[in-house]
Amino acid sequence: MTLQHDALRREAPRSDRVLIPRAIWLLAAGMFLWGFGYGLHTYMFPVYLRSIGCTPSQVGVVFSVSMAATAASCIPGGVLADRYDRRKVILLTWLAGAPSPILYYLARDYRMAAVGIALYSGSLLGYPALNAYAASSATAGASGAAFGVINVGFAVGMIASPLVGGRVSDVWGPKTVFLWSLAFFLAASCVMAFLPPERREAKSEAAAGAGAAAGAAAGAGPRGGGSGGYRGLLRDGSFMWFIAFYSVCAFAYYMIQPLISQYLADVRSSSMQAIGMLGTLMSLGQALITAVVARAADRRGTVVAVGANLLVFVVSLLCFVLVPSPAVTLVCLFLLGGFMAGQGVVYAGVGEILRERADGKAFALFSLAMSTVSIFGPYMGGAMYARSRGTPFYLAAGLVAVGGALLVREGIAIRSGRGGGLAAEQIPGRPDSTTI
C-alpha cells in the first residue's frame, strides 16, 4: 500500500515544479508577438471605426462578421487538425491572417473593415489544431498550466502594446498602427515554423505496430478513434452542458466587448491615448488573472476555476457601469481582463471532461458553439447601446452570472465523479483514458 502510494506521488506532477515543454514555450512566444500586434490596435479599433463614419450598429456588424467567420472556420479547422500535420496547419493559418491589418488601413467604411476582420477571424481555422497540439504537448496532469502559459504569452504581449498603439496613433495617425500590427503578425508566424513534433503523436506512431493509439492524437483519417466524431461528442451530456453554459457567457461578453472602448469615449470622454492606456490595464489584468485561474484549474478543476472567475467578472462589469469614479474604473478594467484570462484556460476544460478523447473535433465543436451563438451579439449590443448606454452591460452581467454559476455546479459534479470524464470511466464502451 505504501509502495503504491509512493508511486502515485511520483507520477503526479508537482504543482510547484510543473515542467513546461519546449512546444508550449514556443506557442507562448508566438502568442506574445501576435498579442503585441493585436494589442496595438484592438482597443482603439471600435473608436477608429466610429471616426471614419460608422454608427454603433455598423461597428456591431463588423464584429458580428468576425464571429460569423470564426464560426465558419471551426468545423473545417477540426478536420484539418485531425487529418494533417498540426504544425503546418498552425503556420499556414497564421500567415493567412497576418495581412488583415492592411484591409483596416484601406477601409473607408464598415464594409472593408468587415472584410479585414473576416480574414483575421477566418484564420482561426488553425485554432483547433493549436489547441489540440497544445493539449497533446502538455505535461500529463498540467494542461491548465500549459494553456495558461500560452494565454499569458498573448496577454503579456498586449500589456504595453495598447500604450504604444495610442502613442503611434497620436503622432503618426491611427492608420500607421495597422502597419505595425502587420509586422508583429508576420514575426509571430515565423516563430510557428520552429514548433517540434507532437510528443503524443510520436508515441502513437511507435505503438501503432502493436495496435495501440494515443488518445490525444485521435480523430479522423490517420489519427484514429479519439472522440468518436461529432456524433459521439453530441451524445456526451456533460460536454454538451459545458459547451452550452460557456457559450451563454461568450455571447454576453462579445455583445459588450466592442462597447467598452466606445463607452469610455462617449460617457467618460476618454481620448485615444487614454483608451490605449486603459486597454493596457485590461491586458495586465488578463495576464495576471490567467496565472491565478490556471493554477486554480490544476488544483480545483478547470470548469470550477473558470466559472468562479466569471462571477468575479460580473461584479467588475456592474461596478464599471454604475460607479463613475476614476479609481473604481481602473480597478474594474483590470478585473474585466479576467474574461479573456478564463477563455485562455477554458480549453483545458475540454480535456478535463473528455480526457484523452479530446481531439481536434472536440476543440472545433467547442469553438463552433461559442462563435455561433456570439454572431449576433455585437450587433445586438450596438443596437441597444445606440438607445441606452447601460442596457447591454446589464444584460451581459445577468447572462454571465447565470452561466458562471452553472459552470461551477457542473465543475463540482465532474470533480466528484458524477459527470464528465470521471463519470465516463464508469460507462462501458468508452475508451479508457487518463487526465491530459
What are the language-model segments listed below?
Residues 3-21, 198-242, 425-432, 436:
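Juxtamembrane intracellular "pre-TM" segments in multi-pass secondary transporters
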Residues 17-67, 240-241, 245, 250-268:
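Helix-loop boundary and gating motifs at the non-cytosolic
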Residues 32, 111-125, 328-341:
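Hydrophobic core of transmembrane alpha-helices in multi-pass small-molecule transporters
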Residues 67-75, 125, 158-159, 283-291, ...:
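Residue-level signature of mid-helix packing/kink "hotspots" within the transmembrane helices
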Residues 74-85, 169, 290-301, 385:
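Helix-to-loop junctions at the C-terminal end of transmembrane segments
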Residues 88-102, 182, 304-318:
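Structural signature of the two symmetry-related core transmembrane helices
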Residues 118-154:
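Cytoplasmic helix-loop-helix junction between adjacent transmembrane helices
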Residues 303-343:
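C-terminal transmembrane helical hairpin of 12-TM major facilitator-type secondary transporters
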